Amino acid sequence: MNIHNKNIVITGAANGIGHALAKRIIQESPKSISLIDISSSVNEVARSMNADSYVVDVANENDFQSVLNSIIDKNNSIDLFCSNAGI
């Protein structure tokens, strides 16, 4: 799959599988990458990758939907969503 110039969202990106996935995907030059995690350490991870970060509990449907709406407002779309929270 070609992800160059795509808008990517990765949950659970502060560590583990989500973090590893973000590090790999950033090498493919996506148009944007948005990292989501319940831990505020996602902010540091995002800064190191020149990505956007959002601290939210994905189990809280209203808060999570608000973050997704913000991402769509900023980037016009989400082309690839990688759900890794809680894995």
Q: What is each model feature region?
A:
Residues H19-K23:
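Residues forming the Rossmann-fold NAD(P)(H) cofactor-binding site
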Residues I71-N76:
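Glycine-rich phosphate-binding loop signature in dinucleotide/nucleotide-binding domains
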Residues I26-E44:
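Conserved glycine-rich Rossmann-like NAD(P)H-binding loop of the short-chain dehydrogenase/reductase
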Residues T11-G12, I78-G86:
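Rossmann-fold scaffold of SDR-type NAD(P)-dependent oxidoreductases
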Residues Y54-V67:
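The beta1-alpha1 cofactor-binding region of Rossmann-like NAD(H)/NADP(H)-dependent oxidoreductases
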Residues V9, S34, Y54, F81:
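Conserved Rossmann-like nucleotide-binding pocket used by diverse enzymes
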Residues M1-V9:
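Flexible N-terminal pre-Rossmann segment of NAD(P)-dependent oxidoreductases
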Residues N7, A14-G16:
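Conserved glycine-rich cofactor-binding loop
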